[in-house]
Amino acid sequence: MSMAHGHAGEENTDGCRTYECGFVWIEEIQIMGERNVIKAALLGAGTVGSGVYALSEMLKDEMFQKTGASLEIKKVLVRNVKKDRPGIPKEIMTDNWQEILEDEEIQLVIELMGGVEPARTYIVQALEAGKQVVTANKDVLAEHGQEILTLAENSGCDIQFEAAVAGAIPIIRPLKQSLAGSMLTEIMGIVNGTTNYILTKMSEEGMDYKEALAKATELGYAEADPTADVEGYDAGRKIAIMSSLAFNSKVTFSDVYMEGITKITSDDIRYAKEFGYVIKLLGVTKLVDGKIEVKVHPMLIPEQHPLATVRDSFNAVFVHGEACDDAMFMGRGAGKMPTASAVMGDIIIVMRNIVHDNCGWNGGVAYKNYPVKPIEETRSRYFLRLQVADKPGALANIAGVLGNNDVSIAQVVQKRARDGVAELVVITDSVLERHFNDALMIVKGMSVLREVSGIIRVYGD
């Protein structure tokens, strides 16, 4: 190939085409076999896998422009080779992983199977065989991320996983590269579109939780079994991955405290608005005094906060660093084409690295083994709704118990009594979780208490 001038994709008088590849113009000779072809295997042909295959066919010229090579998906690993998959030729389908692993022509493995096994085994074996890997598998990375990244580094192989956390939102590379000098101290993310859609409908249209979940299911945002979404497990895997990268320390899914949105009520939404807040399910990780906090739970955040404006199924990640201050990344966090587009971005990076012989994961000199702080030792403000007997002194007695256990009240509203029961809505100052729990246990034993209707953490220290 030679240097040339012209517009990308423009045919010259000699029958060649010129492409802009970075800052270099590349001339493609129209002779069979002249292109550098990178052969890949796609593991999984489901929603995202089929999207990746379709994009790889649509973007052939664009990929060559950006990398100087062409991509050929030589094999697609599926469970059932007899099943018709529109757009994917049957002759490239296989149910035999060993056939892919032992094929020396295949340089790149694109893992889109989901689940921990056999995906983890396939990723490990691919890296051990010297193959580059792109994956969107948050389950594997949240459980075995450090093991896999260390293996990639030691074997001199690429592993890219931008799509594993927030779909089309670019956050993995910024955490590893652009923000590497920012001294990050906190990440907060709306990283589950299903729960954000549900909470948006509850807030804006007055739906209760069951109505909003039914609507999310109808639109395809929620699975038939929504447990992983609504209980915070999906967000927990994503915040574990981001925490590991941000603080260069091992954080796994089992380290994450998780609390979902199933107990959020219309009353919680309404009272939050009265105080100037909206409720979001957030993944949060902080580095405080050499210890990592990592958790997922609903939170009241001020209406003026950037995350408060993230609606429906959109995702967003908000980061704070001592050097960079605040930054937010927002976009589609899931879906066939948004996720496939993030996978394609990773594929293009790996292809470019193969062409320039620059493969390999660089995780840094060493991991910092920061301990993960137990949830009982973290601090938060709290929103607390109590149903109490409508008797003189009830509020004073409860305030006294809270105060005696280091729980200071920042705001309190007493709602009109009904049938001899009054509702107290309290927002506390920042308090240790264990002190708050100790106080709550005592309050639950008080004769004036009828019910604890809601407990939600509040943004701010």
Protein language model features and the residues they cover:
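Substrate-binding/catalytic subdomain of NAD(P)-dependent oxidoreductase enzymes
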Residues: E211-T309, F314-A316
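Short hydrophobic alpha-helical segments enriched in small aliphatic residues
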Residues: G6-A8, G15, E20-V24
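Rossmann-fold NAD(P)-binding glycine/threonine-rich loop
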Residues: R120-Q125, K138-V165, I172-L175
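A short hydrophobic/small-residue beta-strand
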Residues: Q132-V134, I409
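Catalytic, metal-anchored helix/loop core of enzyme active sites in primary metabolism
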Residues: L184-M188, N196-L199, S203, K215, ...
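Oxidoreductase and adenylate-handling cofactor-binding alpha/beta cores
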Residues: I171-L184, T195-M207, R237-V251, D346
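N-terminal glycine-/serine-/threonine-rich beta1-alpha1-beta2 phosphate-ribose binding loop
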Residues: E27, M32-A129
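A conserved regulatory-domain signal marking ACT and ACT-like small-molecule sensing domains
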Residues: I347-D461
